[in-house]
Design a protein with these regions (language model features):
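Glycine- and acidic-residue-biased ligand/ion/polar-headgroup-sensing regions
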Residues: 1-11, 111-141
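Short acidic-glycine-tyrosine-enriched beta hairpin
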Residues: 5-29, 98, 139-160
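Short, solvent-exposed loop/turn and secondary-structure capping segments
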Residues: 11-12, 36-37, 55-58, 120-122, ...
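Histidine-/acidic-rich catalytic cores in large beta-rich domains
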Residues: 11-14, 23-25, 38-42, 51-53, ...
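Ligand-binding loop in jelly-roll beta-barrel domains
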Residues: 13, 28-51, 149, 158-182
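Short, low-complexity cationic-aromatic patches
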Residues: 36, 100-103, 118-126, 165-168
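A short, N-terminal "cap"/entry segment at the start of jelly-roll beta-barrel domains
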Residues: 53-103, 189-191
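Intrinsic, low-complexity N-terminal interaction/targeting segments
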Residues: 104-108
Length: 191
């Protein structure tokens, strides 16, 4: 969830309004209600397989997977291992998939205010969405950093280096999804 509140559950469930930074999955074929609350509710939604069809309840099916609803206050953050001791390691929350194989996997990445560094990716399809904070990112490989607000998106394919800066007063969180590896390199803070 990027802004506002979202409820995603079966039709008989008690409302559970999840704030920005929350994460949920919804199995294909399951009857569910997705609702938002707030004047500017924005969510990033990934569809695993197209087409995504809204169908009547009598066509529901069980694909064997189960829904996951994780409120932002219950996200489990950990330091990313393998980062040089001189660097501030990113805080990550592994959300889906296995980052050790070549299948798509997603995670949240948290960087402190003042962070400057690189996000290095090598997957065939690399996506990132700003969830909170203000990220500086050069457009089309240029030198000028452009401000990306929550809801902004950047992507690449193959080997790529994304220069990032968390220049606002608050920490920055991005959601990343790739079918390759993700590495981080820090640069000295400009604050």
């Amino acid at each position: 969830m990027i802004s506002g509140l979202v409820h995603n559950d079966d039709p008989d469930a008690v409302d559970m309004w999840m704030p920005a930074g929350s994460f949920w999955t919804q199995p294909a074929g399951e009857v569910h209600i997705t609702a938002t609350k707030g004047s500017n509710s924005v969510a990033y939604i990934e569809i695993e397989e197209a087409p995504y069809l809204v169908l009547p309840p009598n066509t529901a099916f069980d694909d064997g997977s189960r829904p996951i609803n994780v409120d932002a206050t219950n996200i489990g953050w950990t330091d990313l291992l393998g980062v040089p001791a001189s660097a501030v390691p990113p805080r990550v929350a592994f959300l889906r998939g296995d980052p050790q194989d070549s299948q798509p996997h997603g995670m949240l990445v948290k960087r402190p205010a003042g962070y400057h560094g690189e996000l290095q990716t090598d997957g065939a399809c690399n996506r990132a969405v700003v969830i909170t904070g203000q990220i500086g990112h050069p457009l089309l490989g240029g030198a000028d950093m452009r401000k990306l607000e929550p809801g902004s998106y950047f992507s690449s394919s193959g080997n790529a280096v994304h220069r990032l800066a968390c220049d606002g007063a608050d920490e920055c969180i991005i959601y990343t999804r790739t079918d390759g590896s993700i590495d981080f390199a820090s640069a000295p803070s400009k604050n």
